[in-house]
Amino acid sequence: YGTPISFELLARVDAGEQWLKEQGFPIVRLRVHGDILRIEIDKERFSDFIAMADKITAKMKELGFVYITLDAEGFRSWTYIL
């Protein structure tokens, strides 16, 4: 998506995905578009995500992401990693 890939960025993405899995989102993908972090989860889990939105946003900002978004299309395994 035009975002330069670095080991530091990959480590932050991995940390965010692992943390979300620990919070009860077993199917999750984080995608980075510049300053935007796009979170993909199963659509069935959207209400759980919204209930935890403040906690999730705080954690993702702690990891260094600026703008945190939930992808309205849900998890899609066929798109690019970053």
Regions found by a protein language model. Give the residues of each.
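ATP/NTP-dependent adenylation/nucleotidyl-transfer catalytic domains that generate, transfer
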Residues: 1-82
